[in-house]
Amino acid sequence: MQNQKIRIRLKAFDYRLIDQSAAEIVDTAKRTGAVVKGPVPLPTRIERFDILRSPHVNKTSRDQLEIRTHLRLMDIVDPTEKTVDALMKLDLPAGVDVEIKLQ
């Protein structure tokens, strides 16, 4: 797998889970002899919603809710076969979405 790189993009609502998962991936890749660039924190996407408090009247009384989506990006340069096998066997928390691309 010479001159290849693996790009990993992590997405989660909880920043602690995503940082823990990124640290596990970095440790696994370094243990197998690959070079890791990152994790790079990408901008947090914030979705805001306005919801009426009352079911009948009081249009001016509203609750504001938000969902924050945290993103991390990392590249594994010159991965070995051990690196790919170790990454496939890695057990990450359920709240973390992982996208892996080979380039």
Swiss-Prot record:
Q: Which UniProt keywords apply?
A: Ribonucleoprotein, Ribosomal protein
Q: Which GO terms describe its cellular component?
A: ribonucleoprotein complex; ribosome
SMART domains xrefs = Ribosomal_S10
Which Pfam families has this protein been placed in? Answer: Ribosomal_S10
Q: Which residues form a coiled coil?
A: none
What's its job?
A: Involved in the binding of tRNA to the ribosomes.
Q: Which NCBIfam families match?
A: PRK00596.1, rpsJ_bact
Q: What subunit structure does UniProt give?
A: Part of the 30S ribosomal subunit.
Which protein family is it in? Belongs to the universal ribosomal protein uS10 family.
Name under which the protein is recorded: Small ribosomal subunit protein uS10
Organism, per UniProt? Answer: Polynucleobacter asymbioticus (strain DSM 18221 / CIP 109841 / QLW-P1DMWA-1) (Polynucleobacter necessarius subsp. asymbioticus)
